[in-house]
Amino acid sequence: MTIRNHTLGFPRVGLRRELKKAQESYWAGNATREDLLATGRELRARHWDQQKQAGIDLLPVGDFAWYDHVLTTSLLLGNVPARHQNSDGSVDIDTLFRIGRGRAPTGEPAAAAEMTKWFNTNYHYMVPEFVKGQQFKLTWTQLLDEVDEALALGHKVKPVLLGPVTYLWLGKVKGESFDRLSLLNDILPVYKQVLTELAKRGVEWVQIDEPALVLELPQEWLDAYKPAYDALQGQVKLLLTTYFEGVTPNLDTIAALPVQGLHVDLVHGKDDVAELHKRLPSDWLLSAGLVNGRNVWRADLTEKYAQIKDIVGKRDLWVASSCSLLHSPIDLSVETRLDAEVKSWFAFALQKCGELALLRDALNSGDTAKLEAWSAPIQARRHSTRVHNAAVEKRLAAITAQDSQRASPYAARAQAQRNRFNLPSWPTTTIGSFPQTTEIRGLRLDFKKGNLDANHYRTGIAEHIKQAIVEQERLGLDVLVHGEAERNDMVEYFGEHLDGFVFTQNGWVQSYGSRCVKPPVVIGDVSRPEPITVEWAKYAQSLTDKPVKGMLTGPVTILCWSFPREDVSRETIAKQIALALRDEVADLEAAGIGIIQIDEPALREGLPLRRSDWDAYLQWGVEAFRINAAVAKDDTQIHTHMCYCEFNDIMDSIAALDADVITIETSRSDMELLESFEEFEYPNEIGPGVYDIHSPNVPSVEWIEALLNKAAQRIPAERLWVNPDCGLKTRGWPETRAALANMVKAAQNLRQA
């Protein structure tokens, strides 16, 4: 029984973000469709070859996506919302982009599909929409075309397909209500057709992803798996693939399925290998996800070897990444600025492929010498002075309940804040960032490269902040922001100014569509050596009589959007960050900043996948936010912002944050999210987003008024704020001005109504 290795998927964007550049060039009309398709072909060929050269036996095909793999699956099934459909029913790459970006075939605006987090990762998928009586048919053959491509290049392939039950679970019903699970029998024929086509091509194994099997699914969804896979069996061998959690709670359901193998995440799950071996059919292949696909740390391969060695020779075994390497940067070797010691602790996607090759070879030969050599740096790290800071650990241990309590309850604070700011009804504001123009990005890049001295850089940033203030005053906004010209990314910026973080040059990972992020890495205890945001906030406030918000990224979001340490708990990291940012709140307040926004868009996405684990997480997540904010005086207004959120199941925790104002993303869901706040009788102020900043569409005054009137049916108008869904960093100034002008006009109309 020779052990083989494989990956569940590979990053799509390219080492230099070639896919992003090609997409954006095509969207701007500066490149042809053939240019775009050629970039995709080049990236796929390169990535297959790189994995093969690194020692991967079976290459994933179908993991590449032009925007998102769930959206690709929707097109495969012919599931295109009516507003995005071509008149002749055909589907092309522009159809796909219209769904993701919000356009009708005519070029007119049409709402983009809703976007939400892919399980508990930082990747976003486009939510499939289902309507009653919907028809499905094989419409988009990208998977088959790419399999042909890989086979022509001589590769051993393992096609990747999002499974039918998970696909339905991830979607939403639109229009008349019905049970979306009832569509299962309608999509299965398309899946069968795809598997038949793959079998014709000589494919032996298909990776069919069913990550929903790690969740606490309703019984009727669990029961749907057996008939679904009964219908799909017989064409090719199916590797039922799960990730992000363990499968033990649903193992009885899984073991009864007519598949030939199971992939389990042995990094994030608590599954016991011996129990899996005992309970799974003896003729099944077990794919052991031993190398973490969603972090940057080098694996201790001696530990991984020990974890799996007892079942070697007892069943067919593959070793694999825990999940797709989509969530990891591509190649550590191009990182030339990382300190040698720190660099020795890391492994990116290509290095993880190398780890899988080392592990496979050791398990096949029994010789662990290379594993021991590979693991030595990560073992030495445990004693590094770069990791431990006694002062931080002491401060964390001294936290009391008082440290997370504001001085007075909300009602008293609200009165103090009204007296201080005297804002009109329907106060208008934005979420924080303004367009990051080529000029701004060039300024930061020149400074970073050493082509610009600090004085010239600061003069340039000050000018952009001044412009942002002038623009906002001209538009008539009530509460202003400085625009964040100095910030490349809302998490990276703070990480750069906190001890305990390091940064990469090319550690890009895809967030959604063409958007990539470069998460910082938490390598040690976190502290703040000096104030971070105070100087620019103070400068912006000096330019206007209107209040300017101080802008902080909250502790849970910094944690969730960074690559965390693996040697301490997430709670410990979050509270260390909270203590550092608590000092920033105190310094902003002392500098005369009266409104401070602490963004926590990631609070919900950090939830464990199993509901039974939620309470413990929410308890420390809320406490971290409160530690961060509670130092503020009563007349300092604390705002928070959240996006991509379903709130109804965590309303207690949202209220427990005790923020004076919460702004939320609601426009894509047509204010549906406010229902949660209404039912809960949420006591504090709320700013429901009135337009979608992920789309270039400019909302009309009437559209915004209609949304605000809808909001006022659920939340008393005196507690409503008016704002976009999210920051405006990715937009251009022309559409930003137009959209905000309409937003301000809508608020003014409502004040006069």
Swiss-Prot record:
L-methionine binds at residues 431-433, 484, 599. Binds 1 zinc ion per subunit. Its EC number is 2.1.1.14. The keyword Transferase applies. Its cofactor is Zn(2+). GO terms for biological process: methionine biosynthetic process; methylation. Disulfide bonds: none annotated. Belongs to the vitamin-B12 independent methionine synthase family. This is 5-methyltetrahydropteroyltriglutamate--homocysteine methyltransferase. It comes from Citrobacter koseri (strain ATCC BAA-895 / CDC 4225-83 / SGSC4696).
